């Protein structure tokens, strides 16, 4: 029979390391967060062989006193909290005192530090958690932590490390997130002597975004802000024309801490409404300032999961902030820029001789070799990521060689299957209040257009005061009809159209049972089905907004939408129905219309709440300015844009 014993401290630290230190990126995260908590304004991260050989973090923070250096390597020794009350008002990134001893237990760790006013600094060397020496040493104010031979005493962990390229991607992702979280700090990441990422540390979030996403992307992001008594929201989101194939480019920060929160991600998408294409996601960098008492960060070892009080209120604020900022924008894509992007995507090869970083990267002067300020960067045109990408932020774009054109995936519109989302228990009805405020989108000033032609029975040409406009006739009429249906669907007071021959609908037993429970939702949109035999329903009348020839397919699709979700928001349901009906009833491509019909369509479009996107998020029209046309014909030359121009935004 085995007996209960107290584990040795070194073994306990190795066990804790299994939770906190998963890979080299975890070491970078924990050490950089310590540097941030120490009040650093400049942090340099140097790695070799993706961090498995060496990770070195140098900061200019307040350092560690000589008599506290050894104590820093003991479990649960921390300067961040003093008592139980502090645990409910955490204002620092670290607070448990686990990271440094956990890292030391699975590596060879060297720590060099000094505090302001001290006659000398301190050097500590530990191997596998055992302190080998603590000696006085010369050091500038701040701390330098060098971690070598990571996992040397836990070979099983090394077996599960991915390729160096993959591990480096994770490190780049971590540093990028921290750079966006703290634009007031200058970050520099150097891998095997080459600078991979750098932020200026000016305190301007847009400049930090430019350093990570690139200058062109930063210029296509708009500022958002909102607040109430409990929350203060600020940040940037991309215009609908700048999207990615997954949510990995959404960065949320609470009090400077990067978090993952499905409901807040959902609130961001709700703020965009129908302005995004199906399967596309925005770039977003959103800072949320909150009383620490309302956020519990002591939930997960990585501290990326946070429990938030008044979460529904926060969701509404985020959605409202984005929706209000988008209302102020004229969301007509720049046609000339889209043509340029298309040309780059269609290249079969892109010459690349050195490691690519980001589009339109700004440069720093080179100094002597191997100094942190050195950089060697290759410009490239940003490609849209594949939907299967699982590496986050710009890490994958930083590492991949650009030898293939990007693949665009324009998904067919389908009813949303919320059962397959990350949180299948999400109660969509809980955000009805916020969604109701966002459903009505106010139009920005729409240009006065003079129609003069049609091309291929698909595109309308019109002239405005500031140039040429090309309109997708299907998308335009789809938007017009969508807003008409949005008004009429659910108006159950309107008269119903009686059917001479009723329709009978039959469903499998389990679906029929679920439909009985959700029948009130169909009645909310003017569809009254009555039970008729076993697993059958009869329809004797239909709402006037539904054409008789569409009844059978339309009712089945409406029922499918109900069956696909566990919880249904009636506002969402009505919106999906309006999208479905508007798409079916709009003119298609290769359909010629007369001048009167074209002018009438443009007038109806100008009266829409949101005339710039179809309900699926595709652009309705694109714009060539007079300046664009002159550039195309080389009448004028385009000027280069510098980082300093960001101050204009």
From Swiss-Prot:
Which one GO biological process term can you cite for this protein?
A: mismatch repair
User: What SMART domains does its record include?
Assistant: DNA_mis_repair, MutL_C
Q: Can you name this protein?
A: DNA mismatch repair protein MutL
Q: What keywords does the record list, in alphabetical order?
A: DNA damage, DNA repair
GO molecular function list:
ATP binding; ATP hydrolysis activity; ATP-dependent DNA damage sensor activity; mismatched DNA binding
**Species in which this protein is naturally found:** Streptococcus pneumoniae serotype 19F (strain G54)
CDD domains of this UniProt entry?
HATPase_MutL-MLH-PMS-like (cd16926), MutL_Trans (cd00782)
Give TM segment ranges: none
One GO cellular component, as annotated: mismatch repair complex
Superkingdom is Bacteria
Which HAMAP family does the record match to this protein? DNA_mis_repair (MF_00149)
Annotated InterPro entries: DNA_mismatch_repair_CS, DNA_mismatch_repair_MutL, DNA_mismatch_S5_2-like, HATPase_C_sf, MutL/Mlh/PMS, MutL/Mlh/Pms-like, MutL_C, MutL_C_dimsub
């Amino acid at each position: 029979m085995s007996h209960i014993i107290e584990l040795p401290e070194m073994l306990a630290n190795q066990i804790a390391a299994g939770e906190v230190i998963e890979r080299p990126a975890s070491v970078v995260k924990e050490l950089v967060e310590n540097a941030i908590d120490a009040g650093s304004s400049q942090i340099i991260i140097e790695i070799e062989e993706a961090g498995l050989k060496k990770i070195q973090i140098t900061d200019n923070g307040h350092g560690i006193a000589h008599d506290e250096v050894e104590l820093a390597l003991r479990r649960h020794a921390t300067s961040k909290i003093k008592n139980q009350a502090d645990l409910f008002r955490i204002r620092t990134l670290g607070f448990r005192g686990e990271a440094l001893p956990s890292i030391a237990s699975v590596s060879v760790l060297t720590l060099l530090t000094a505090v302001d006013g001290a006659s000398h600094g301190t050097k500590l060397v530990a191997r596998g958690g055992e302190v080998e020496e603590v000696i006085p040493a010369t050091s500038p104010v701040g701390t330098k932590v060098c971690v070598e031979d990571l996992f040397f005493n836990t070979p099983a962990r090394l077996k599960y490390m991915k390729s160096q390229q993959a591990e480096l991607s994770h490190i780049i992702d971590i540093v990028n997130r921290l750079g966006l979280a703290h634009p007031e700090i200058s970050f520099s990441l150097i891998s095997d002597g080459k600078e991979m990422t750098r932020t200026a540390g000016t305190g301007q979030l847009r400049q930090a975004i430019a350093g990570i996403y690139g200058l062109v992307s930063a210029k296509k992001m708009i500022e958002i802000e909102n607040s109430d008594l409990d929350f203060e929201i600020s940040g940037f989101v991309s215009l609908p024309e700048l999207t990615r194939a997954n949510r990995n480019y959404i960065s949320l920060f609470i009090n400077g801490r990067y978090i993952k929160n499905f409901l807040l991600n959902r609130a961001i998408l709700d703020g965009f409404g129908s302005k995004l294409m199906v399967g596309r996601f925005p770039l977003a960098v959103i800072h949320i300032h909150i009383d620490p008492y309302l956020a519990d960060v002591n939930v997960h070892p990585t501290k990326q999961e946070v429990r938030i009080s008044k979460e529904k209120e926060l969701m509404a604020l985020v959605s409202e902030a984005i929706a209000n900022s988008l209302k102020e924008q004229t969301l007509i894509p720049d046609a000339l820029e889209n043509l340029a992007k298309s040309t780059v995507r269609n290249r079969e090869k892109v010459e690349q001789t050195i490691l690519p970083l980001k589009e339109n990267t700004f440069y720093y002067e080179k100094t002597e070799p191997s100094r942190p300020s050195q950089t060697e960067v290759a410009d490239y045109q940003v490609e849209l990521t594949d939907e299967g990408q699982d590496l986050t932020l710009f890490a994958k774009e930083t590492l991949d060689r650009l030898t293939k054109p990007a693949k665009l995936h324009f998904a067919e519109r389908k009813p949303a299957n919320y059962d397959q989302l990350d949180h299948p228990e999400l109660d969509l009805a809980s955000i009805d209040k916020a969604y109701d405020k966002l459903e009505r989108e106010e139009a920005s000033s729409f240009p006065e257009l003079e129609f003069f032609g049609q091309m291929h029975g698909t595109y309308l040409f019109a002239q405005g005061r500031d140039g040429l406009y090309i309109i997708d006739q299907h998308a335009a009429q789809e938007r017009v009809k969508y807003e008409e249906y949005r008004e009429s669907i659910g108006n159950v007071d309107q008269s119903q159209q009686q059917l001479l021959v009723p329709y009978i609908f039959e469903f499998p037993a389990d679906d029929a049972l679920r439909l009985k429970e959700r029948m009130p939702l169909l009645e909310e949109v003017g569809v009254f089905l009555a039970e008729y035999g076993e697993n059958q329903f009869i329809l004797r009348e239909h709402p006037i907004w539904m054409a008789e020839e569409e009844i059978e397919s339309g009712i089945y699709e409406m029922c499918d939408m109900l069956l696909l979700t566990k919880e249904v928001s009636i506002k969402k349901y009505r919106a999906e129905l309006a999208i479905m009906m508007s798409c079916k009833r709009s003119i298609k491509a290769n359909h010629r219309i007369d001048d009167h019909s074209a002018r009438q369509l443009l007038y109806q479009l100008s009266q829409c709440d949101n005339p710039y996107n179809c309900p699926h998020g595709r652009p309705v029209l694109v714009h060539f300015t007079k300046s664009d046309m002159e550039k195309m014909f080389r009448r004028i030359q385009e000027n280069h844009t510098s980082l300093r121009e960001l101050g204009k935004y």
